Amino acid sequence: QPWLPFV
């Protein structure tokens, strides 16, 4: 699971 604060 990648860490993406905003997409």
UniProtKB/Swiss-Prot annotation:
GO terms for cellular component: extracellular region. It is found in: Secreted. GO terms for biological process: defense response; positive regulation of smooth muscle contraction. Its main location: secreted. The modification Pyrrolidone carboxylic acid is found at residue 1. Coiled coil: none annotated. The keyword Secreted applies. The modification Valine amide is found at residue 7. The keyword Secreted applies. Keywords: Amidation, Amphibian defense peptide, Pyrrolidone carboxylic acid, Secreted. It comes from the Eukaryota. Expressed by the skin dorsal glands. Induces contraction of intestinal smooth muscle in isolated guinea pig ileum. Belongs to the frog skin active peptide (FSAP) family. Peroniin subfamily. This is Peroniin-1.3. It comes from Litoria peronii.
